[in-house]
Regions:
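Helix-loop-beta element that forms the nucleotide-linked donor phosphate-binding surface
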Residues: 40-51
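Short active-site oxyanion
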Residues: 24-30, 100-102, 190
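Cap/insert and terminal regions of metallo-dependent hydrolase folds
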Residues: 39, 109-196
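Conserved phosphate-coordination/catalytic loops
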Residues: 10, 15, 83-86, 108, ...
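Active-site metal-binding motif and surrounding structural segment of the metallo-beta-lactamase
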Residues: 1-33, 37, 48, 122-127
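Core dinuclear metal-dependent hydrolase active-site scaffold
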Residues: 1, 52-120, 196-202
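Structural motif
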Residues: 4-5, 100-102, 125, 159
């Protein structure tokens, strides 16, 4: 795997799977959200682990764990079994003196605390997991098209990269449908919807 380091926002199977365990070198620097995830990765043989804080670093890159996200609706988290399954999933802000500030929202729905994170950090580039995955009867567990528009209205100068579509079977929003929505709302200059494996450079 050609990466200097890895950030694991959480350890659901669609983010951290058997392929990751097998392909990533056990001494690769890996940043995780909490002690629980660190313990899991340690049990899988990884030993160069950092639990992210509000101010972690990797070389000249400042890594800030955000706390505003929630991997589902309040209704879903009111059910203890479902809350345990959804768990915690963080966002991350990356800053470097010579690069644009990047905010990776992670698996979260749109909520006031996410808006507060965006206003606080003022990122130049925002990566949104925008497949609009749902738990039946409990609503979305990640963002959808309206949420992407909310981000654009809040930070109109930011570039938005929409990912995590067509990734798992409970994602309701396809790349094609999101592209049509973006065009209908005339925000195409602000939004990238990359294909799997595509690199986006700003």
């Amino acid at each position: 795997l050609d990466a200097d380091a890895v950030i694991v926002t959480h350890t659901h199977d669609d983010h951290w799977d058997r392929a990751a365990v097998e392909l990533i070198a056990k001494d690769k620097p890996i940043y995780v959200q909490n002690d629980r995830d660190a313990a899991l990765l340690r049990s899988q043989g990884f030993h160069n682990l950092t639990v992210m804080t509000d101010e972690s670093t990797f070389g000249d890159i400042r890594i800030t764990k955000t706390h505003g996200g929630q991997h589902g609706t309040d209704r879903a988290y009111a059910v203890p079994e479902l809350a345990e399954r959804l768990g915690e999933a963080c966002g991350v802000v990356l800053r470097h003196p010579d690069e644009k500030t990047l905010y990776i929202a992670g698996d979260t729905v749109w909520r006031d605390a996410v808006a507060a994170d965006l206003q606080k950090h003022q990122p130049d580039v925002v990566v949104l997991n925008a497949g609009y995955a749902h738990v039946i009867g409990f609503g979305p567990i990640i963002m959808g098209e309206q949420d992407l528009l909310n981000v654009h209205f809040l930070l109109p100068q930011a570039k938005i990269v929409a990912v995590h579509m067509e990734a798992i079977n409970h994602c309701l929003l396809s790349r094609r449908a999101l592209r049509e929505y973006v065009e209908a709302n005339q925000i195409g200059d602000a939004v990238s919807i990359p294909q799997d494996g595509e690199t986006v450079i700003f």
